[in-house]
């Protein structure tokens, strides 16, 4: 059966149709309502001892949040925990897996999901000897982890400041700094079963021992690497073809002042956002624009988010179109966790309302402390809290996603302009006694 109704917007042949309360019809669409100001909370995961440098990744197939943490006084091995979302916004964590993911004191680590249930790629700097990568497979039911063979990315010399980003199923891009030569390397990583292979590119020399980041736009495999040299934060563009990284253009100097803790996220429309601590302790963010159709990148003017920060992380709320800053707020309780949304407009951003999530000093979010999960309607993760370095989770709400799918009635067979009369092919049963939409 078919019905006719006024189109509330231009419709194309085959569009799925929802009916509005005024009797007009429109495309079924996702909706989003902003949570303003943002809300959030933190819950204790583990306080049995000190835990450091929590890095997080989301397994979309298994619907689990995974955290890799450094056990004990900054010199212990890496452990993996996972969180399951229950009713409401809270996560229930399993922190009982005691398998060490590495064998030597880590100087830095990062993790990404490889696109299938329980399968992750861990990259870490192993003591004074190497930077390495391996597949980590999680059995959530047991629970247990199994470890793939270790691949040396840098086989000799002390390394630090690593990062890794998923780039498709069983694909990733990573970076690691070799301390003895102050050289930053990038790696295109491919996984077959649990075996990792790599292709190496030299990014830069004279790289300082600060946080480095790598992020990629999965729509066009164009990415950004950020690192620090001569006290300035640098952005470098690259393209990725599935097996190799190619550097593009020249360095983009994001700062004219000394920086320290920094983070990076891809948002949308070829826009990345970098966030860092200024040498005057300000929290500063900029929009970086880069796509793979040209050889240059650009960045907008500095946006001051807060006046006294240190460690920080970024997540992108794709439903609410907000960049979420998560940072140690040195101006409140000597380091509580504060979150603040940023709205991108062209090459700049507007700053939303800042909200504190706790009242505890020395809260330390690392650059992958939070991950936005659309199906959970929020950004989730974990970080160390207090001088005892206990681990707490993060739960941040900046928008609520919805859909007009509950108003779905069928589809249109031909295009119609806004205000025109649409003929809708109704799917399902109809009421033969109803002669119109009124």
Per-segment meaning from a language model:
Residues 89-91, 144-145, 196, 245, ...:
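Residue-level signal for glycine
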